[in-house]
A protein has these predicted regions:
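Short secondary-structure boundary/capping segments
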Residues: 20, 42, 67, 124-125, ...
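Active-site catalytic pocket residues across diverse enzymes, especially alpha/beta-hydrolases
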Residues: 44, 119, 175, 179
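Structural recognition of alpha->loop->beta junctions
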Residues: 26-27, 95-102, 126, 207-216
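A contiguous loop/helix-start segment that scaffolds small-molecule binding in enzyme catalytic cores
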Residues: 2, 60, 71-75, 131, ...
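Class I S-adenosyl-L-methionine
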Residues: 1-109, 114
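A generic local structural motif
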Residues: 14-18, 38, 62-64, 120-121, ...
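Class I SAM-dependent methyltransferase SAM-binding "motif I" and its flanking Rossmann-like core
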Residues: 11, 82-155, 198-201
Length: 267
């Protein structure tokens, strides 16, 4: 049995409880050594067989999986962040299907959510944005034209842009070409939730400058949108007094006034 486990965004204690237990039970672990916090390997058994996939090809990873299955061993494939986002897991799953090897997935905390926690952000502020776009610049892996930065920027939604730290000048140019103003709030978060995390609030126009000043060349996430400065937004209707839910009846203006008067009398 193979388990694809999300390691979380960086901090070792951000792995899920289920993910931690799977690591504790595994006979074999293949981890993404270039990005996964090595502290997570402390959960492994003393006799666990551990492989660093940064040094392996896809074929070599699959060979280890086949050998573990043949020996009746449980294997954890430990991916950085959340495996379903830029995790290259589908090609492994398709191969396992061909080999008739069963597998399951265990989610993890992706970097965009780790970064939001570090900055105390809400991506979906009423009156500002109700959409989060997760994307990347094209590099050695292409991006469909319909998902270009310019087309996505036209939505003026909150954006989390992965794998683009080395292309920040081009990214800024394309974001503004798509409709963002140069002074639109942005953030550059290096190694979100890791002990060495660095986070900087800037603008779309100053992204590259901030990276250069602080020597950030890789492993950073770019966030874009007015939610970053949260200066003007509407309160959620969910907790409004005149809003009914399954658990609470709306109060009329008269009822609210009476309650205020009663409270004033009590005071």
């Amino acid at each position: 049995m193979v388990y694809f486990v999300g390691a979380g965004s960086g901090a070792a204690d951000l792995i899920t409880v289920r993910g931690m237990r799977l690591l504790q039970q595994a006979h074999v672990i293949i981890y993404a050594g270039s990005l996964v916090n090595p502290e997570l390997l402390q959960y492994a058994k003393t006799d666990c067989e551990i492989h660093n996939s940064a040094k392996l090809t896809l074929e070599e990873v699959l060979q280890i999986m086949q050998e573990a299955q043949a020996q009746g061993k449980m294997l954890v494939r430990l991916h950085t962040g959340e495996p379903s986002i830029y995790g290259a897991v589908r090609e492994q799953m398709d191969a396992l299907d061909a080999f008739h090897i069963p597998y399951e997935s265990c989610p993890g905390v992706s970097a965009c959510f780790g970064a939001a926690a570090s900055l105390n952000l809400e991506y979906t502020l009423p009156g500002v944005s109700q959409t989060l776009i997760i994307t990347r610049m094209e590099g050695r892996t292409g991006v469909p034209e319909k998902e270009s930065i310019e087309r996505l920027a036209a939505h003026q939604a909150s954006m989390a842009i992965y794998l683009s730290t080395g292309m920040l000048r081009e990214l800024s140019r394309r974001l503004t070409a798509g409709g963002y103003a140069p002074d639109t709030p942005a953030a550059l978060v290096y190694k979100a939730t890791w002990p060495e995390e660095e986070a900087y609030i800037c603008t779309v126009e100053t992204l590259a400058w901030v990276a250069e000043v602080h020597g950030i060349t890789k492993t950073a996430l770019v966030l874009v949108g007015d939610v970053i400065t949260h200066g003007s937004y509407q309160k959620s209707r969910l907790y409004a007094a005149d809003f009914s839910t399954e658990f609470r009846q709306a109060k009329s203006n008269a009822t609210q006034t009476e309650e205020k008067q009663e409270k004033q009398c009590e005071d």
